[in-house]
Amino acid sequence: MSVFYQYEVIVVGGGHAGTEAALAAARQGVRTLLLTHNIETLGQMSCNPAIGGIGKGHLVKEIDALGGLMAQAADQAGIHFRMLNARKGPAVRATRAQADRALYKAVVRKALEQQSCLSLFQQAVTDLVVKGERVVGVRTQLGLTFYAPAVVLTVGTFLGGRIHVGLTNHEGGRAGDPPANILSSRLRELPFRVARLKTGTPPRIDGRSIDYSQLEVQPGDDPVPVFSFLGSAEDHPQQVSCHITRTNLCTHEIIRASLDRSPIYSGEIEGIGPRYCPSIEDKVVRFSDKASHQIFIEPEGLETFEIYPNGISTSLPFDVQVALVRSIQGFEQAHITRPGYAIEYDFFDPRDLKPSLETSFLQGLYFAGQINGTTGYEEAAAQGLIAGLNAGLQVQEKEPWYPRRDEAYIGVLIDDLITCGTSEPYRMFTSRAEYRLLLREDNADLRLTPIGRELRVVDEVRWRRFNTKWKAIERENQRLVQQRIEPDKVSEGEAVTLLGEPLRREYRLIELLRRPHISYEKLMRLIGEPMAVEPAVAEQIAIQAKYAGYIERQQLEIARQQRHESLRLPLDLNYHQVRGLSVEVQEKLARVQPATLGQATRIPGVTPAAISLLLVYLKRARFLEETGV
């Protein structure tokens, strides 16, 4: 057998999931092959050229903390940065960057080409090589066979992909790319549960045909935020402004008059679209009382005139697209460079996955990204990292690793998918995390980088930077706990200016920092000292001080929940034998087959009373004693 054809991990697909999967496997020193139908589209931003947002920015920070690429690529390609929810608490603050598509792809490709233990090869995969109940490789359209004990499928919208513009449709993985229909047919022969989803994209506009004088300017933040814990504002290219406009009643009337030509409303499309990123047709129909809908005018890059009008995703016929676009203020003379379209594709029920993202039916086969029913670059990249990491661990005969819900948004994402499944494209929000005060953007490295180091996906540069930051936090926290300030050391006027009231007794510095409106900077001014630490360290110290009580309560709640989380349920448990459970609950438990009691609590329809009955049954059957809990 030729060495060229033998690898330890094969990743199929070069999108956001595939690139993170390949890098995560290769960083462990595992010989990895990334197969893509087109090397030129590695890291392609198929829809909106943006990274981050509410919940999504948290995922990007966690990917970065585990040594992933997305945050660094966003920093090096980001041309417009904003901190969303900046006036709210730290748990829901989220970074978002508008990226230059070409720059982003270039950063991703360079990282892949420079990664040791990683090879790239351009070939479409058409089949899996299966031996018994294990995947052992893949076959390509040229008839080449590549062997590996672990295969990660990150095929996006390419499985059975069909593109719709009006009542016209054709096969396609995305505009300009062929679908993976042969692979889709092969996977349908396996015992996976398969369904259809759809997503869409707006028409692209030539920015030279837009009248910007009629649009509202949306500048980026100053100072400019940074995504990566290794990054700085100096990494960013030139920054530009975005703009805002709105649809109007004329736009809505054009859309309503054309609904009979919409593939969504004519029944041509059966797949369910993303709830939180609906098409403009959906918005007009579902929110008929609204006189207008906001549109964000976002540049596609520094070296192109193309504009992404975020908010008017559509699959209406092209003539209707022209009419609705030109009905919008500032777009009266707009020239469409690419039509909007919807794409319908296969996805596989993620309840057929293990928490490691390995499939339950074929050992060594992992799924990540839109194949699991998610939407978004960030959700895909997070899954890719975990799948690639675990594929690498498996070939090294090591135990799988995946974060719990209380450890990371990545853990929330995976647990939601494998426990509840999804009937629509799944998008991450901060509201999905019950422990979001602990899972902030700012502390993703403190939560995950030590674990990443143990798993060999965090390099020496990141590890040194992390330790410097962590030691600075510990050292400064200790100083603030020990150092005191007396009333006679501060003038009454200075105290009133900085604290809002005179200093009436002796305080430890940490006590003053716990006050809601006292920043670390104000505290240093109060004691007449310069900033002792860098801003990221100061931010972390202030948050930990102000939210100490809330954080402690959440940690106690997690400890209580861990009793359920750690109780593993036997794989052969017959739920129909558990007396008192309703037939509905029995069927749901039997279908999902939760791995732990904690997972069972999160299945929709499984009540606390049902969990109590299950606990009683387990005690009687002596399962608790056998598991040592």
From Swiss-Prot:
Q: Which SMART domains match?
A: GIDA_assoc_3 (SM01228)
**Co-factor requirement:** FAD
Q: Which InterPro entries match?
A: FAD/NAD-bd_sf, GIDA_C_N, MnmG, MnmG-rel, MnmG-rel_CS, MnmG_C, MnmG_C_subdom, MnmG_C_subdom_sf
One GO CC term on file: cytosol
Which GO molecular function terms does the record list?
Answer: flavin adenine dinucleotide binding
Q: What does this protein do?
A: NAD-binding protein involved in the addition of a carboxymethylaminomethyl (cmnm) group at the wobble position (U34) of certain tRNAs, forming tRNA-cmnm(5)s(2)U34.
Subcellular location per UniProt equals:
Cytoplasm
- Its protein name is tRNA uridine 5-carboxymethylaminomethyl modification enzyme MnmG
For this UniProt record, give its keywords in alphabetical order, as a comma-separated list. Cytoplasm, FAD, Flavoprotein, NAD, tRNA processing
What does the similarity note say?
A: Belongs to the MnmG family.
Provide a GO biological process annotation.
tRNA methylation
Q: Which Pfam families match?
A: GIDA, GIDA_C_1st, SAM_GIDA_C
Kindly list the positions annotated as binding NAD(+). Answer: 273-287
Chain sites annotated for binding FAD:
G13, G14, G15, H16, A17, G18
Q: How does it assemble?
A: Homodimer. Heterotetramer of two MnmE and two MnmG subunits.
